[in-house]
Design a protein with these regions (language model features):
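Mobile "lid/hinge" segments at catalytic clefts and subdomain interfaces of large enzymes
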Residues: 114-130, 135-140, 154, 162, ...
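Glycine/proline-enriched, intrinsically flexible loops and inter-domain linkers
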Residues: 5, 23, 53-55, 189, ...
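Phosphate-backbone binding interfaces of nucleic-acid-interacting proteins
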Residues: 1-202, 206, 339, 358, ...
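A carboxyl-terminal module marker
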Residues: 2, 20, 439-442, 462, ...
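Beta-rich nucleic-acid/ligand-interaction surfaces
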Residues: 39-43, 200-202, 491-492, 496, ...
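Extended, well-folded interaction surfaces typified by the phenylalanyl-tRNA synthetase beta subunit core
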Residues: 413-579, 718, 770-774, 782-803
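Conserved mixed alpha/beta core segments that line enzyme active sites in large multi-domain catalysts
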Residues: 33, 47-78, 242, 246, ...
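Terminal amphipathic helices with adjacent charged low-complexity linkers/tails
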Residues: 185, 189-214, 391-420
Length: 803
C-alpha cells in the first residue's frame, strides 16, 4: 500500500526523516518494500528567472538569459517553447543535470547557438496537473512568481516528498489506510494523533422517501447510508488531487474523488448511487438470484448465482457488494441526488465472488482482508464532512444504519504483567507496558488484585488474548531488548531424517538424476479436473471429499489423483511457451472410505511423473521407472491395462511381483485434442503421465540394499526376432522369457516391425537377451538349450514363432 510521507505529516508531528521513519516502521512490524523519493532521477535542476529573451532568427528557438541564483545570474539557454514571458520563473536543468528516465543534460549548440542547459516542462520533471497545477500545459512549467532563483526545484513543485510502499500483513486490516499507518507512526514516535475532521451538519429534509433493507445480515453485518441532495459536480481542490495522485489515482470529479479519498484515508470503501437511476428508490442487500446479470462500471457483464452478494434496487442488481458498482446506477454530470453507502461485508463472500468472477478492485482488496464494523461510521462521517467542506451537495437528515444485531463492544482481556513478560522472556516495567498499550489506543484498568483489564480498540479485531498484548508491547518496546541466550538444558536430541523421509529424498534424487524437476501443486481441485481426464462416474477417484469453505469453486474438492494437477502444470507450461520438460510430484491423495465422511480419510502418498515435448516418448517414463526400481533393488513388470486417460496402445500397468503399483503411458488422443493449447502444440507435443502408489512401492523395498558382487564371467548376448500377434504385448513376451531359465538376465526390446513379409495382424519384435551364471561361464550348449526352451514356451503360451 502506498502512503505519502507528506500525508502522514498531516496527522502526526513527525520529527524524523523518511529514512529514519522507514527503520522505525520496520522495527514495529511493518515492512516498507520500497521508499520512493518523488525527485528520483532529478539533480541540478533549479528555479531560473528569465531576465532576457530574444528570438533566434531563422529558427523556432528563443534565446533566454536566465538568473539561477548562486549557479549564475546570466546563464544562456535556448528553448523551443513559446508560453513564457520576461520575468517568468521556470525549471532550469543546468549543464551536468539529470532528469527522470536517466536523461543527462549537457551544454551544446542548438542551431549554432550555445545553450548551457534546458528549460523544462512539467512532463519532463515527471509531473502532472494533480501533483502541480499547470504541469500538463504544452510548453514550459511556469512557477509561482515568488520563487527564488537558484532554489532546488523539488520543494517548489512538491517533489520533496517520499512514498512508503508498505506490505500490510493479513492480520492488520486496520492498517489498510493512511490513517491506520499514521496511528502506528504516532505510537512509535510517541506523538499525538491528529484525527481528520468528521463533523457535519444536516441542512435539509429529503425530497422523497427511500427504502433500504438488508436481507442477508450474515453477509452484511452493517450497512450505513446517507442521502445527499442538490449534488454540485465540479473540480476537486488541489490538496485532494495531490493526495490521490501520490497514491496512484487520477482526479475525476469532486464527488468521485471524495469516495476514493475516503477509501485511501480511512480504509473504508464507499459507493454512491445515483437515486435518479435507482428503480423504486429502493436499496436491497441480498444474495443474487441464479442467472441474474450485472454490467459493472468497467463495462464487464457477469452472470450471478446465490453465492454472490449484490446491492439491488426494486428491479435489478445495481452493484456487486464490496467489489464494484453497476454501470446502471453510477453518477455522471447530470446527477442531482446521491445515496452514499458505507458497509461491512463478509470477507469470505467478497473473496469468493471476486475470484469466481475474476473481478478485483481496491474495495475488494480491503474487504477480503477485513473491514471492522465500526469503520463504516467513521468513513461515512468523514465523507459527509468533505462533501460539506467542498460544497458538493446538501446533506439531508435521512440516514440509515442497519446491523445484524450484535453489540459493538471492545474486546476485554484480563491478564497480568507477569504473564506478558513470561511470554516475552524479559522483564518490561509495568508502566512502560501501560504507556505502550495506551499509545496504541488500548485502555488498561489496573484491578485491586494487580491484574489488568485491557480493552482493545474496535478496529483491532486481531487481538484475542494476552499473547497478542505481549506482541504489541515488544514491537513498540523493541525486539533488540531480547537478549539471545543458550538453552539451559542438556536434553537436546540430535536432528535427522527418519526412514520414510530418507526414502522420499532418495526417490527425488533418483528422478532428478533422470532429468526430472520436482513440482508442487495444491491439494485440491474441482470435478472439472476429473472430467478432463474422463474419469468414469463410478470410479473410486470420484469419491472426493468436498471442502465446506473452498477458496473458490475450482478448488472445491480434495484431490484423489495427482495426474490432473500434473496435466494442469504441463498445459500451463505449454501456454507460456515452455515446450518441453520432465516433472514429478510426490504428495498425498485423500481417499474417503465412504461419503459423507465419518472418519479421517486415508492420506495415501503418491508419486506422479510427467514428461512433455516433441522428443519425449514411452521409454522416457519407462526409463525413469526402471532407474527408480534399480535404485531400490527392485524389478518392475509391465502389463497391458486400460486407463481412461491414457492411450490404449501406448500405456501399461506397473507391477512389482504380484503387487500393482500404478500406470503410465501417453495421454489419450481424445484428451490431448481437448486441451486448451494451440493446435500446432497438440499436433507436435507428446505428453506422458504416470502415477504410482508410493506406499505400495515402498512396501516392496526390503530394507537396505545388499551388496551383490559382479560376476567374474562374461554374459552371453543373443538376439531373437519373434513374429507374434498384433495384440501380444512386450510385457507378456518378457515375462515368458524370464520364466524359462534363471540364466536369463536383462531383456531389451530393440526393434518392432510391421509390413512386408508378415501376415496381416502380425508384427515382429526383436529382443536382446543377456544370459549369465554368477558361478561359472555359460557354455554354448547351455545357451542353445535355454534359447530352445524360450522358443518352445513362447510358441506354446503365446503362439509366437522365430522369424
Amino acid at each position: 500500500m502506498k502512503v505519502p510521507f507528506s500525508w502522514l505529516k498531516e496527522y502526526v508531528d513527525i520529527d524524523v526523516t523518511a529514512q529514519e521513519l522507514e527503520e522505525k516502521l520496520f522495527s514495529c512490524g511493518f515492512e516498507v518494500e520500497e521508499l520512493i523519493p518523488l525527485d528520483a532521477g532529478i539533480s541540478k535542476v533549479v528555479v531560473g528567472k528569465i531576465v532576457e529573451m530574444e528570438k533566434q532568427e531563422g529558427t523556432h528557438l528563443t534565446k533566454c538569459v536566465v538568473d539561477c541564483g548562486d549557479y549564475g545570474h546570466d546563464i544562456r539557454i535556448s528553448t523551443g517553447a513559446t508560453n513564457m514571458k520576461l520575468g517568468d520563473c521556470v525549471p532550469a536543468a543546468l549543464d551536468g543535470s539529470t532528469l527522470p528516465g536517466g536523461i543527462k543534460i549537457k551544454a551544446r549548440k542548438m542551431q549554432g547557438v550555445e545553450s548551457n542547459g534546458m528549460l523544462c516542462s512539467g512532463e519532463e520533471l515527471g509531473l502532472n496537473d494533480d501533483l502541480f497545477p499547470g504541469s500538463e500545459v504544452y510548453g514550459l512549467l511556469i512557477l509561482p512568481e515568488d520563487s527564488v532563483p537558484g532554489t532546488d526545484i523539488a520543494p517548489v513543485v512538491g517533489l520533496d516528498d517520499y512514498i512508503f510502499d508498505i506490505s500490510i500483513t493479513a492480520n492488520r486490516p486496520d492498517c489498510q489506510s493512511v490513517l491506520g499507518i499514521a496511528r502506528e507512526v504516532a505510537a512509535v514516535l510517541g506523538k499525538p494523533l491528529h484525527m481528520p475532521a468528521m463533523d457535519y451538519k444536516t441542512v435539509c429534509e429529503p425530497d422523497a422517501p427511500i427504502t433500504v433493507k438488508v436481507e442477508a445480515p450474515d453477509l452484511c453485518p452493517r450497512y450505513m447510508a446517507h442521502y445527499v441532495r442538490n449534488i454540485r459536480m465540479g473540480e476537486s481542490p488541489r490538496w485532494m488531487k495531490r493526495h490521490l495522485a501520490l497514491c496512484g489515482l487520477r482526479s475525476i470529479s469532486n464527488v468521485v474523488d471524495i469516495t476514493n479519498h475516503t477509501l485511501l484515508e480511512m480504509g473504508q470503501p464507499m459507493h454512491a448511487f445515483d437515486l435518479n437511476k435507482v428503480a423504486g428508490r429502493t436499496i436491497d442487500v441480498r444474495r443474487a438470484h441464479a442467472g441474474e446479470k450485472i454490467v459493472t462500471l468497467d463495462e464487464k457483464e457477469f452472470t450471478l448465482n446465490p453465492n454472490n452478494l449484490v446491492i439491488c434496487d426494486a428491479e435489478k442488481p445495481v452493484a456487486l457488494a464490496g467489489i464494484m458498482g453497476g454501470a446502471n446506477s453510477g453518477m455522471d454530470e447530470n446527477t442531482t441526488s446521491l445515496l452514499f453507502e458505507c458497509a461491512t461485508f463478509a470477507r469470505d463472500c467478497v473473496r469468493k465472488t471476486s475470484r469466481a468472477l475474476g473481478q478485483n478492485s481496491d474495495s475488494s482488496a480491503r474487504y477480503e482482508k477485513g473491514v471492522d464494523r465500526h469503520s463504516p461510521e467513521l468513513g461515512l462521517a468523514r465523507a459527509l464532512h468533505l462533501i460539506q467542506e467542498l460544497d458538493c451537495g446538501d446533506i439531508t437528515t435521512l440516514e440509515y444504519d442497519l446491523t445484524d444485531g450484535r453489540p459493538m463492544e471492545r474486546k476485554h482481556i484480563v491478564t497480568t504483567p507477569a504473564k506478558i513478560c513470561g511470554v516475552l522472556g524479559i522483564t518490561v516495567p509495568d508502566q512502560t507496558m501501560i504507556d505502550i498499550l495506551q499509545r496504541l489506543e488500548f485502555t488498561v484498568d489496573v484491578q485491586a488484585d494487580g491484574s489488568w483489564d485491557v480493552s482493545a480498540p474496535l478496529y483491532r479485531e486481531d487481538v484475542e488474548s494476552f499473547p497478542d498484548l505481549a506482541e504489541e508491547v515488544i514491537r513498540e518496546y523493541g525486539y533488540d531488548h531480547i537478549v539471545p541466550t543458550f538453552l539451559n538444558t542438556a536434553s537436546v536430541t540430535n536432528g535427522g531424517l527418519n526412514y520414510d523421509q530418507k526414502q522420499q529424498l532418495k526417490t527425488k534424487r533418483l528422478l532428478a538424476a533422470q532429468g526430472f524437476y520436482e513440482a508442487s501443486t495444491l491439494a485440491f481441485y474441482s470435478n472439472a479436473e476429473l472430467d478432463m481426464l474422463h474419469i468414469p462416474a463410478d470410479d473410486e477417484a470420484r469419491k472426493a471429499i468436498r471442502i465446506l469453505n473452498p477458496i473458490s469453486e475450482n478448488l472445491s474438492i480434495m484431490r484423489t489423483l495427482l495426474a490432473p494437477s500434473m496435466l494442469n502444470v504441463i498445459v500451463d507450461n505449454l501456454k507460456k511457451g515452455n515446450t518441453e520438460g520432465r516433472l514429478f510430484e510426490m504428495a498425498p491423495v485423500y481417499l474417503a472410505k465412504e461419503l459423507p465422511i465419518n472418519e479421517h480419510p486415508h492420506e495415501r502418498q503418491t508419486l506422479c511423473i510427467g514428461a512433455f515435448g516433441p522428443e519425449e516418448d514411452f521409454f522416457t517414463v519407462k526409463g525413469a521407472l526402471e532407474a527408480l526400481a534399480a535404485g531400490f533393488g527392485l524389478s518392475f513388470d509391465y502389463k497391458r491395462e486400460t486407463t481412461p486417460w491414457l492411450h490404449p496402445g501406448i500405456s501399461a500397468a506397473v507391477y512389482c511381483g504380484d503387487k500393482r503399483l500404478g500406470v503410465f503411458g501417453k495421454l489419450s488422443n481424445e484428451i490431448n485434442g481437448e486441451l486448451e493449447i494451440a493446435k500446432d502444440q497438440k499436433d507436435n507435443q507428446n505428453i506422458y503421465l504416470g502415477e504410482l502408489d508410493y506406499e505400495a512401492l515402498m512396501s516392496c523395498v526390503d530394507g537396505e540394499l545388499r551388496y551383490q558382487p559382479l560376476s567374474p564371467y562374461a554374459a552371453v548376448k543373443r538376439d531373437l526376432a519373434l513374429v507374434c500377434d498384433e495384440k501380444t504385448t512386450c510385457g507378456e513376451i518378457e515375462e515368458t522369457i524370464k520364466k524359462a531359465s534363471p540364466l536369463v538376465g536383462e531383456i531389451k526390446l530393440f526393434d518392432i516391425y510391421r509390413g512386408a513379409n508378415l501376415d496381416e495382424g502380425k508384427k515382429s519384435m526383436a529382443f536382446t537377451l543377456s544370459l549369465s551364471d554368477p558361478k561359472k561361464e555359460v557354455s554354448a550348449e547351455e545357451v542353445e538349450r535355454v534359447v530352445k526352451k524360450i522358443l518352445g514356451n513362447l510358441k506354446f503360451k503365446l503362439g509366437i514363432e522365430i522369424r
